[in-house]
């Protein structure tokens, strides 16, 4: 068997990659995160919107994987094929930043969890925590350098291991669930700080996106799949599995403790919910599960970060140095660039801990990472819609075209809703992070002797720059904060 064929990923590994990417730290903090924004009624409405929106997005990724198998790189490739080089670059850049910002947040949460057992790690932002996080970062880095397939196998093992505590949590809370607690204040009327039901639903949206980031994981690795048809299957199977886990964890928690009680919990709040039911050993169980979960999620996202930059560099949308692979067919330069950025921001976390805004480093990274991935998701959904409108690949399949048109239309509407729900603040902060990427885009274009921007791309870039300038001034003046 050749080295290339031995690196191919089967359906099980691809599905584990999707599940492993989505089940990181988010689900373990879900009870408090949701209760801080919404009560039971709004939570149920929000999950219904999320289920429909994210399922249509999963179906779009499945359809694109089947109908456009020649496109490698997922969100990046779809944006480029549909809307040009700069949109493709922007999707790659935004996805990449989202991924490694999420990794920084995961490192902080991991050592914050260890702080439950070893106070020296505090909330994940002490000297000891940053030093140990750095050691772990580079250990994962060199593991991935040994080969994509080897790391994917380890991810499969950690995915299975971390799901067990989640099922135990669900089973125990199912028996501890009390209907009178669940229905005590369905619409949150006793807590005016939550606002209207519409505001509650809107405020919980970024959290739902955060816990679903990774749904596109299999499509990013489409070029390494043993069967291209497995990419779509892995996306949908992974989505349904994670959706069930998320909804059960969230809803059952609200039948064990009230919304005000959940909102006041420290994270990982799932550990404290189980401790409330069964005692100290419950918190230990969930904390161990979280540690395994975070290690698996970090491994998944280290892989995804490098792969998206590598895919963009292969066709000259990113500079040439990012497409170089080592002897194990790993995009080594992309991996080095990614983890250097993570290392820098781990140091930044230490120096920005205790900011007067009161927001912890993990939450800041969560919100920024989520806002950065909204644009790549939008362009992927829009490309699915574009194919159906043009009839491309549907020449003899009118019925499928009509079905996919509806699905892609819903996915686009959902993506636009997410941009609205995220709010102007995070749209401007995203522009501030998107704008500097044009330097790499210009370098890549210079390497192949092409003009940097063409046509409408100039207007889009101008809008990004204006948004970035407004954000920069806002941070300076104080009307915007991270």
Curated annotation (Swiss-Prot):
Spans traversing the lipid bilayer: 11-31, 41-61, 101-121, 125-145, 157-177, 203-223, 236-256, 284-304, 334-354, 366-386, 404-424, 426-446, 459-479
Assigned keywords, A-Z: Amino-acid transport, Antiport, Cell inner membrane, Cell membrane, Membrane, Symport, Transmembrane, Transmembrane helix, Transport
Gene Ontology CC terms: plasma membrane
Compartment(s) of residence: Cell inner membrane
Keyword Ion transport in record: no
Cytoplasmic side: 1-10, 62-100, 146-156, 224-235, 305-333, 387-403, 447-458
Disruption phenotype: Mutant is unable to utilize extracellular arginine as an energy source under oxygen-limiting or anaerobic conditions.
Membrane topology per record: Multi-pass membrane protein
GO BP terms, alphabetized: arginine deiminase pathway; L-arginine transmembrane transport
Topological domains, Periplasmic: 32-40, 122-124, 178-202, 257-283, 355-365, 425, 480-482
GO molecular function: arginine:ornithine antiporter activity; symporter activity
Main subcellular location of this protein, as a coarse class: membrane
Catalytic activity field: L-ornithine(in) + L-arginine(out) = L-ornithine(out) + L-arginine(in)
The family this protein is said to belong to: Belongs to the amino acid-polyamine-organocation (APC) superfamily. Basic amino acid/polyamine antiporter (APA) (TC 2.A.3.2) family.
Functional summary from the UniProt entry: Catalyzes electroneutral exchange between arginine and ornithine to allow high-efficiency energy conversion in the arginine deiminase pathway. Also mediates the proton motive force-driven uptake of arginine and ornithine, but the exchange is several orders of magnitude faster than the proton motive force-driven transport.
Protein name: Arginine/ornithine antiporter
Native organism: Pseudomonas aeruginosa (strain ATCC 15692 / DSM 22644 / CIP 104116 / JCM 14847 / LMG 12228 / 1C / PRS 101 / PAO1)
């Amino acid at each position: 068997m050749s080295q290339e064929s031995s690196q191919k990923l089967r359906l099980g590994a691809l599905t584990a990659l999707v599940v492993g990417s989505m089940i990181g730290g988010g689900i373990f903090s879900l009870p408090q995160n949701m209760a801080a924004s919404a009560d039971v009624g709004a939570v149920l409405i929000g999950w219904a919107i999320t289920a429909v929106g994210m399922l249509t997005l999963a179906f779009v990724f499945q359809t694109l994987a089947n109908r456009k198998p020649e496109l490698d790189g997922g969100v990046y490739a779809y944006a480029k094929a549909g809307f040009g080089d700069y949109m493709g670059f922007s999707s790659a850049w935004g996805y990449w930043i989202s991924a490694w910002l999420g990794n920084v947040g995961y490192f902080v949460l991991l050592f914050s969890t260890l702080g439950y057992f070893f106070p020296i790690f505090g909330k994940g932002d002490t000297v000891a925590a940053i030093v140990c996080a750095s050691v772990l970062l580079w250990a994962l880095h060199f593991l991935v350098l040994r080969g994509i397939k080897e790391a994917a196998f380890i991810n499969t093992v950690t995915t299975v291991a971390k799901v067990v505590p989640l099922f135990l949590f669900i089973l125990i809370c199912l028996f501890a669930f009390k209907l009178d607690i669940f229905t005590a204040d369905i619409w949150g009327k006793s807590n005016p700080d939550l606002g209207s039901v519409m505001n509650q639903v809107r405020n919980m949206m970024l959290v739902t996106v955060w816990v679903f980031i990774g749904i596109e994981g299999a499509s990013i690795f489409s070029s390494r799949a043993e069967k291209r048809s497995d990419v779509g299957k892995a996306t949908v199977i992974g989505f349904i599995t994670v959706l069930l886990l998320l909804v059960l964890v969230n809803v059952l928690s609200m039948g064990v403790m009230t919304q005000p009680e959940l909102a006041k919990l420290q994270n990982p709040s799932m550990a404290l919910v189980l401790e409330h039911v069964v005692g100290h050993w419950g918190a230990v169980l969930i904390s161990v599960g979280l540690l395994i979960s975070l290690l698996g999620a970090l491994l998944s996202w280290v892989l995804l970060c490098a792969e998206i930059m590598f895919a963009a560099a292969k066709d000259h949308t990113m500079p040439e140095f990012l497409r170089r692979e080592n002897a194990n067919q790993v995009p080594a330069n992309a991996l080095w660039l990614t983890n250097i950025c993570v290392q820098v921001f781990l140091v930044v976390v230490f120096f920005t801990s205790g900011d007067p805004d009161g927001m912890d480093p993990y939450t800041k990274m969560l919100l920024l990472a989520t806002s950065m991935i909204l644009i790549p998701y939008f362009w992927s959904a829009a490309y699915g819609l574009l194919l159906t409108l043009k009839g491309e690949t549907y020449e003899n399949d009118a019925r499928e075209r009509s079905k996919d048109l509806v699905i892609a239309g819903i996915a686009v509407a959902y993506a636009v809703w997410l941009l609205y729900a995220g709010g102007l603040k995070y749209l401007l902060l995203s522009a501030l992070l998107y704008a500097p990427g044009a330097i790499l885009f210009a370098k890549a274009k210079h390497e192949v002797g092409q003009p940097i921007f063409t046509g409408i791309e100039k207007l889009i870039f101008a809008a990004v720059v204006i948004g970035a300038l407004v954000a920069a001034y806002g941070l300076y003046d104080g009307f915007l904060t991270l």
